[in-house]
A protein has these predicted regions:
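Transmembrane alpha-helix termini and helix-breaking/packing motifs in multi-pass membrane transporters
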Residues: 46-53, 105-110, 166-186, 259-261, ...
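Helix-loop junctions on the cytosolic side of multi-pass membrane transporters
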Residues: 138, 142, 184, 188-214, ...
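C-terminal transmembrane bundle of multi-pass solute transporters/carriers
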Residues: 62, 72-76, 83, 89, ...
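Short amphipathic alpha-helical segments
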Residues: 447-470
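Short, well-ordered beta-strand segments in beta-rich or mixed alpha/beta enzyme
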Residues: 378, 434-442, 472-501
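Glycine-rich beta-strand-turn "strand-cap" elements at beta-sheet edges
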Residues: 382, 401-432, 469-482, 508-534
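Helix-loop boundary and gating motifs at the non-cytosolic
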Residues: 9-68, 228-273
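Substrate-agnostic recognition of the 12-TM MFS/MFS-like secondary transporter fold
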Residues: 26-42, 66-81, 85-100, 117-176, ...
């Protein structure tokens, strides 16, 4: 890691403390420009679709096209961000977004944009966002102290919501005065400026002692890590449900704005700005809220407030009623999103952080994409107001139910130890194929059940989290106290990687295992190559 924090930085827990660090401040401004471009693009695309067609499903599909790539490409992008130099990867994603914006501007100039073309290019822009988000999420914990991570993530939320205000304002002004094409051109310019800032970042090149991981195995390991953690799965379930219902208000907002008296692009801008302002104001109070409530309680309360605000928006027949409701929705949105983001960040070690955050992104964007399509179709069958009301009711009931089914959204507060086994030849030049590691334990008969429970739950999860291909526990029939743990790795290099990934929690678990062993010598370890038939 490249933490530049000293003791003073660790003790500075004010909401703006991370901005006092030059690297974070530079990246935060870059993220602000990137988010500003994203919101300008989304607003312009959504409003343009209303001029191309009046069908609610087409308009809602703009939101689906923008978010679906993040669901489809989340894990591959996270694996790449963990396996490649993050600075270069971040730079490439920005240049992609700029290229898409320029191409869309050209098609608009030629008059070749149709609803299908607009959706396709919105999808292409979403590809750039899908590739960009995991790498930025993985970089932030590198440059701020762990104690300041909640504040750093809240500031990223402020960046998102400041752009949620400024983006629609700028886009609305340009659309009303000079036309939509200028929104996409400005989007391209801001993306290029952000790319220039990233290129000037003096980041030490990443070193991969064991070489870069292959894409498919890296994806498998990232998925395994998250799936072997109940707290992380609880976070993923909550973020999926929260965005599945809350995306309804964003997907249908252009039509809601038009339905209000005198509704136009300015009405749409005011509603989006109200939501963004609510999020910014709420971010200032998040440190106090975190001290008063647990993460579990914060997420549940925020979800219920979000559902209530959606119901109010669906019933509002005047802008002065809808805008305050959107303000409350924005406050609830950042409270829930920030709390869940902090929970998963604190539960991920550096080696798998981008992959873990990409799976979080998949859950978030999958919920958004599916929700936009579902609630758009419900609006087509019924009405916009009915669709929003049903979404609000579903969100409140769903989040309340999951809070009792999976109440744990805590995280393991550990860091990498980088513990390397000195007795192992790390070159392994002559080793090819899958590797099987056999570890033999001798356990007192009275403690057999206790040992089995430890190994089959904590032991299994630890091995699979760190990348093992498979795991088994064998119990000797003739010697009841004799167990053999069988760990299969995809290759010799992947076997070595597991030692680089050990955390304090893994080390504590190793001591627990050894406490059960009563043999005169340490547990016997055998390393085998699996001979496969041809």
């Amino acid at each position: 890691m490249t933490h530049s924090a000293n003791e003073g930085a660790e003790s500075d827990l004010s909401p703006i403390a991370p901005l006092r660090q030059p690297v974070f401040r530079m990246l935060w401004l870059t993220w602000l420009m990137a988010n500003l471009s994203m919101w300008m693009n989304d607003v312009a695309a959504a409003w343009m679709m209303t001029s191309l067609t009046a069908q609610p499903i087409w308009i809602a599909l703009v939101q689906t096209a923008a978010t679906l790539p993040m669901f489809m490409l989340g894990l591959p992008s996270g694996a790449l961000a963990d396996s490649l130099d993050r600075k270069r990867y971040f730079l490439i994603t920005q240049l992609w977004v700029a290229s898409v914006a320029l191409f869309l501007s050209l098609l608009l100039f030629l008059g070749w944009v149709t609803p299908l073309v607009l959706l396709a290019l919105t999808f292409a822009n979403g590809i750039g966002l899908a590739m960009r988000w995991p790498v930025f999420a993985a970089i932030v914990p590198e440059i701020v102290p762990r104690a300041q991570l909640p504040s750093a993530l809240a500031l990223n939320g402020v960046s998102m919501n400041a752009s949620r205000i400024l983006g629609p304002l700028v886009a609305g002004t340009l659309i009303a005065s000079v036309g939509t094409i200028w929104v996409f051109l400005l989007n391209a310019v801001l993306s290029v400026v952000a790319a220039v800032v990233i290129s000037r970042w003096q980041r030490q090149a990443q070193v991969f002692p064991l070489g870069k991981e292959r894409l498919l195995p890296a994806m498998r390991v990232g998925f395994q890590y998250v799936m072997q953690s109940d707290p992380l799965k609880g976070v993923l379930l909550r973020i999926f449900l929260f965005f599945f219902h809350s995306t309804a208000v964003l997907a249908l907002l252009p039509l809601l704005a038009k339905d209000l008296p005198g509704g136009n692009e300015k009405t749409y801008t005011v509603l989006l700005a109200s939501m963004g302002l609510g999020a910014i104001v709420s971010a200032a109070f998040l440190p106090r809220l975190r001290k008063r409530f647990s993460r579990y309680a914060l997420v549940l309360r925020a979800a219920l407030l979000q559902a209530l605000s959606m119901a109010a928006v669906s019933l509002a027949d005047q802008l002065w009623i809808a805008a305050p409701a959107m303000f409350l929705g924005g406050a609830a949105w950042i409270t829930a999103a920030n709390t869940l983001s902090v929970s998963i960040q604190l539960g991920l070690p550096d080696w798998v952080r981008a992959r873990g955050m990409s799976i979080y992104q998949m859950a978030l964007m999958g919920g958004s994409a599916l929700g936009a399509a579902v609630w758009g179709q419900v609006a087509t069958w019924t009405s916009i107001q009915t669709s929003l009301s049903i979404a609000a009711f579903f969100g409140a009931c769903g989040m309340w139910a999951v809070s009792y089914w999976k109440p744990d959204i805590g995280s393991t507060e550990d860091t990498n130890l980088r513990r390397l086994p000195p007795e192992i030849d790390r070159n392994g030049a002559s080793v090819h194929g899958k590797v099987s590691i056999l570890i033999e334990y001798v356990v007192a008969p009275s403690r057999v059940d206790e040992f089995r429970d430890l190994m089959q739950v904590e032991g299994r999860r630890s091995r699979l989290r760190n990348g093992a291909l498979s795991w088994q526990l064998l119990h000797d029939i003739q010697q009841p106290g004799r167990f053999i743990e069988v760990i299969v790795d995809d290759s010799w290099v992947d076997h070595l990687r597991r030692f680089d990934r050990s955390t304090e929690a893994d080390e504590l678990l190793r001591h627990k295992r050894l406490e059960f062993h009563i043999g005169q010598n340490p547990p016997r370890i055998s390393k085998m190559i699996i001979e496969e038939s041809h």
